């Protein structure tokens, strides 16, 4: 990666008023550190969901928090509605009671789980369908209890977490 070329291009875009912030997608912390020598990175768009929580465990999201980099989550619903895995079966069982408790649906619980993370992750819902956008907005109204957050995470992991 030629950081000088990228930095020059971004500086030019900022000077022309074309962009206000600069973000990257799927960058590992080492890539961000390299590029950050020349330019402020404001966002990193990564795959993150209950189906793929590894960025929360491998230090990626911690790195974002330490360096004041916003996290955007693509594929925030993960494979929950696509694959009938043991993990998803355990989560569905938990959701039976949580859907009732929060008067919502599984899609919104998946988004609320992401939104509850203290790093203020922004899910990218990836739809242009009005009904789905309105439904996703309802997830912002859910104040997921921390115990429920951990019960969802533990269901995905298949074990208690400390």
Segments (PLM) and residue ranges:
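Beta/alpha (TIM)-barrel catalytic core signal, keyed to glycine-rich beta->alpha loops juxtaposed to Asp/Glu
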Residues: 1-162
